[in-house]
Amino acid sequence: MLSAHPFWSLDVPRLDGQLLLTPCPGSQQVPMADALAQLQLAGAGGVLTLMTEEELALCGSLSLGQLVQARGMSWFHLPIADDEAPDAAFEQAWPGVQPRLLALLREGRHLAIHCHGGSGRTGLAAALLLMTQGLPQQEAMTLIRARRPRAFTLACHRHWLDTRGRRLTGAD
């Protein structure tokens, strides 16, 4: 019997696609190829990877991007170091990637977002996408925590999101 790779669905305001919050494909006793097949079957048209290359190597997941693309899905790699807030490289890359993520969701395809465990950095990126669609920060965090209770447990993540929230609302 095939084991199921876990993911939690989240609607995005004003868009047809959903966010699929998930641990790293291949890290939950489900082979990576099977996990990706399951995410694709659930409607994923893209995968946003938030793990660093070093983390991917430690997990034996360096081929993740190639496998995602081989399945016909889009792969977006925006690494954030574990237990840290996004750095300048993320901040610089985000404006170029965000429109592509939203376009995918606008087309009704789902976006799988993952870090290693599928909570911390995953919740951060999901909240940012929800906030760019007009959802208030606290509401976005509440929706994500309902699915991933360990999201936003790090002060650096909450502080970074507070700063982004002020920028999005023009209060900064």
Where would I find each of the regions flagged by the language model?
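Cys-dependent protein tyrosine phosphatase-like superfamily
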Residues: 1-112, 124-172
